[in-house]
Amino acid sequence: MRYNNEVFVKYRIDKNSIVFWTSDINENISAAKVLNEFLYDFSKGKKIFFHGYRLPEEHLSQIFDTKVILEKSEIINDPFNIFLRLSDAKININHFDCACESMIYYFDNKINWTDFLATSIISQPQKYIKEGILIAYFASVDQGADYWFECSKDYKENVLIFLRTLTALGCRVKQVSHLSFPYN
């Protein structure tokens, strides 16, 4: 039985990465705030790229402060996708239901905006984490109902601290041996 505002988090550690998945974390204000802070802290010192699918531009300001937008890419004849380069990932996950899917990509400073737009990173983030090109990505899928974060194992301790914080808030955190992206 699921109680009001109860948050469940599953995570997996493998040889290349650490992953966590949660559903409806935005319904618990404290847990959502911790996730927002984790994503912002994780973005410091990294290049941040954002992809929104079926995200009306007028809703961008609900997800993050539009002052953090450094660049925007318009893809000709594609009204469904929006690509942004951000100065940081200070976001509000409570408004990710504005889009069918949203993803935040975290890179080191060697990757530039043009390289990001020209690669298949969007469709194969796990491959690029394994190759060391992508540090991490955060996905909001199913109109903000499910959240997925995967990063290089180099950042394992950051994720474990985040998970311990959620546990202290009363969230149910469980390590599992198998966890795959739910919408591949």
Which role does the model predict for each range below?
Residues M1-N184:
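Structured alpha/beta or helical-core interaction and ligand-binding surfaces enriched in interleaved
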